[in-house]
């Protein structure tokens, strides 16, 4: 129960946002409204879930560059948003379910927390309570930048920032260097 764990599953809301920019003049699917009005293409979803990248999601970290949205080509804006949203929720739930017995709720941050469709899918697939970090008094738009600031301070103080249970390193270690431009 006192073990520190972490996962970075890669795309978060990025694939949905990319789909919206490619298929419309919108930057994101506000509240997941387009996904809600679309229909998941189960054949495409099953095929992409069987793909190597998805199988790689058992690794500690995936990057947005590990994914693309070409699998949704030919779908309507709404059906593509629904299919990509379901794919994203499956990736997130795959990571969560590895540790599900270790926690009772999920605290979410970043833009995806405002996508009701995505959050409802994750809650349904994990059967866990989803909490928007804003409700705990934090601004969910800045958690990642604050995390990097925190890690920079720990690194500056020569404190560990990487652990076997978070990144798979053999021994806990610090990281990074400070450079000065004169």
Where are these regions (language model features)?
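Alpha-helical scaffold segments in soluble metabolic enzymes
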Residues: 18-22, 43-50, 121, 148-151, ...
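Glycine-rich phosphate-binding loop of actin/hexokinase-like ATP-binding domains
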Residues: 1-34
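A contiguous, well-structured pocket-lining segment that forms one wall/lid of small-molecule binding clefts
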Residues: 25-105, 116-124
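Acidic, glycine-enriched active-site microenvironments
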Residues: 1, 5, 108, 115-121
């Amino acid at each position: 129960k006192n073990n520190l764990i972490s996962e970075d599953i890669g795309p978060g809301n990025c694939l949905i946002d990319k789909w919206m920019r490619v298929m419309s003049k919108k930057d994101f699917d506000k509240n997941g409204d387009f996904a809600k009005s679309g229909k998941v293409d189960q054949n495409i979803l099953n095929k992409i879930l069987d793909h190597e990248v998805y199988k790689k999601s058992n690794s500690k970290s995936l990057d947005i560059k590990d994914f693309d949205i070409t699998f949704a080509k030919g779908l309507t804006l709404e059906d593509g948003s629904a299919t990509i949203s379901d794919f994203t929720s499956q990736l997130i739930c795959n990571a969560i379910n590895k540790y599900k017995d270790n926690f009772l709720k999920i605290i979410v941050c970043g833009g995806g927390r405002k996508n009701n469709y995505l959050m409802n899918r994750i809650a349904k697939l994990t059967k866990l309570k989803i909490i928007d970090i804003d409700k705990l008094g934090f601004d969910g738009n800045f958690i990642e930048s604050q995390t990097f600031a925190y890690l920079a301070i720990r690194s500056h103080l020569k404190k560990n920032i990487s652990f076997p249970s978070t990144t798979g390193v053999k021994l806990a270690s610090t990281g990074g260097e400070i450079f000065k431009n004169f």
